[in-house]
Structures are given as structure tokens and as C-alpha cells.
Amino acid sequence: MPANRPVQPPRTATEIGPTLHTYHRLPGPLSIVLLGVLQILVWGGSFFLMAVMADPISRDTGWPSQWVYGALSLSLMVSALLAPLSSRLVARYGGRPQMAASGAVVAVGLLIMAASHTLGLFLLAWAVIGIGMAMGLYEALFATLGGLYGEGAGKAITGITLIAGFASTLSWPTVALAIEHFGWRATCVCYALVLMVVVAPLYWRVLPAGGRVEVPAKTPAKGETLGVDRQLYWLLTSMFAIGAIIMTAIAVQLVAVLQGLGHSLPVAIGLAAMLGPSQVASRVLQILAGKRHPIWTALAWVSLVLIGLLMVTFIPAATAVGLLVFGCGNGLRAIVRGLLPLAMMPPAQYVLLMGRMSRPSLIGQALTPVVGGFLFEHFGSMGVLLTLCLLALTNVLLVTVVMRRVRAAPRVV
């Protein structure tokens, strides 16, 4: 080294980026099942609730249906705003306290909703539920698992998403039956009690303490990616956002779109019901396929989604098959969201960035019902489907770009 060049002191861990403590042993099958059940409970009491509760609420209160459905968009927007903070709290304190508290926060929102007799209080309830969603849904859980188990978290994520894939299949008929017998307000109270009694004790029992990340004392600046390649970061973020938009549009508008294509309401509902089992089936097949780089799962996800949408759009006689193909692809989305970033960046960065990467997805989900409603009103079912096909094609192109990065370097930091 030339004499006139000063020797640089070694950088500390916080200057280089976040670092992790020792990882824990992977959870056993029973723990994975319990974590999946907990996700079903929290998803069912938040994101999936409005699908069966919005109409009874609107009929009972007289509030405009667009405001009732808009409450879910509000909760998603709140969750989007808080998602980066959620990941940072997981990194600083470990995920167990936050995951355990998430059920209680959603429960408080449900209790406020049950007591709401004004639209303003109802919207406040969903803002509180949005806080609980940021604390306890997939992104927070994936960050928690990454902090606890490092690269080994992939196995747990796959198993948990397999079980949690039954969230809508189980929660919709259960909540609908409860509303029929007890009314929507009593159903909210009962669901809140279940969350308060079950979620915190089980999370505290199943998740080990720890998983904290040594983070910089200064909050990372906006747009900072903590040493992760910026182009890769935005490629992954864009992929997940587009996937979330497509999923939300289908979840909200599929029945109406199918009716617009000429199917009766019972047939449309029957076709839509095929999505849940096909999503779970694809996750089972992914497990049976064995260990491989998740970029191949990502390619299967976006390809099947595109093929399924094209079949529904252009081959009316193959609508049922197209929805099965779409469901198989969409079922892989949650697995890819958890596994692909973990394979492309060190676990410590993964813990901190999961929440930030989810923000565009959540904002897109919040805006999708409004934009989708506009497209459906002005351009009909074909307008909605063609837009979704273009988005799905874009995702295929994005995955091919990421695949080139994987072949060049299995991990890009």
C-alpha cells in the first residue's frame, strides 16, 4: 500500500449493514401447522372478512356499499404505510412480541366495528385492523422467520403458506354461517374473542425468542436498500406489486366479470370457488417437487397466471380450466414472496426489507378495487381481463430478467 494512502479502519457491522445473531433450530411439523392456523385466523378476521360481511353491513346500516368496501382499501393503505416500520421493529426486537400482539389489535378493530353506528367509527375500526395486518400478516411473519431461521426459513414458509391457503375456504363459510345465525355485529365480537384468546398464547408458545438484527442507529434513508442491489430490489418489488394487484382484482371482481361474460350468478360463484383448492394443490405440488431455486417457482407462478387469464379471456369454453390454471399459479405467489428474496439477499437484509418491499403491493391492492371498478364500468369484463393479461405478461418479462441475474450470481448483494 502506498505510504501516502491512509489506512481505513475496519467498518462496523452497522456500517456495512444489518447482521443476525445465531439462528434457531427449524420448527417442527406441529409448530408449522399451528403457525398456519394462526395465519388463517388473522387473515380471516381482516383481509378476507369483507367478502362475506360487506353486504350484511350495508343492508343493516344503510351505508353506501362503496364506503363499506372502501374500508378494506383504507386498512390496506394503513398497512402499507406501516409495513416498513413493522419490519424494522421485527429486526430490532424480534418478531414474537409483534406477531403475538397482532391478533389483539385486529380484535380491537373488530370490537370497534361491532359497536359502530356511524360511518366514521366504522372506518376507524378498519384503520385499526390495518395496523394489525401490518403487524401480523405474511410480510411480518416472513421477516420474523428469516430472523429466527435464516436461509432455513424457506421450508417453514412453504409449509405455513400451504396451510394458510385455506384461509378463505374456511373463513368465508364460517363467518357467513355466523352472520346468518347471530348477525354481523355479534359475529365480530365472537371473532374478536377468538383472536384475543388464541393468537397471543400460541405465538408465544410456537415462536422462539430472539431473531433480532443489529441495525444502524440511524433510520435508513428513503430508497436505501441496505447493500442489496438496487435494480434487483426494484425488480422483485415490482413483480410482487403486480402479482398483488392481479390477485386483488380477481378476488374482488371475478364473479362480476364472469357474469359480464354471460355466466349466471350460481355458475359464476361455482367457477370462482375453484380458485381456493387449486391454489392449495399447487403448493402441495411445489413441496413434492423438492428443493430447487425459487426463481423456477416464480417462473411457474407468472406463467400459469398469464396462461389462465388468456384462457378465460379468449377461450370461453375453457373458462373453468383457465381458472384452475390461474389458481395454481396464484397459489405459488405467496411462496415466491417469501422464498425468492431470501434466496437473493442475506437473511439480515431480508428481515429489514420485507416490509419496505411490501409497501407498493399493499398500495396497489388498496387502489385496485377503485381502478378495477372504473374499468369494469366503462370497458366491461373484457376491459378488466385484457388489463390483467397485460400486467401478467409484464410479470413474465420481469421474472425472465431476474432469472438472468440468478444465473449470473445466485446471490446478489
Label the predicted regions:
Residues 104-117, 304-315:
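C-terminal ends and interior cores of transmembrane alpha-helices
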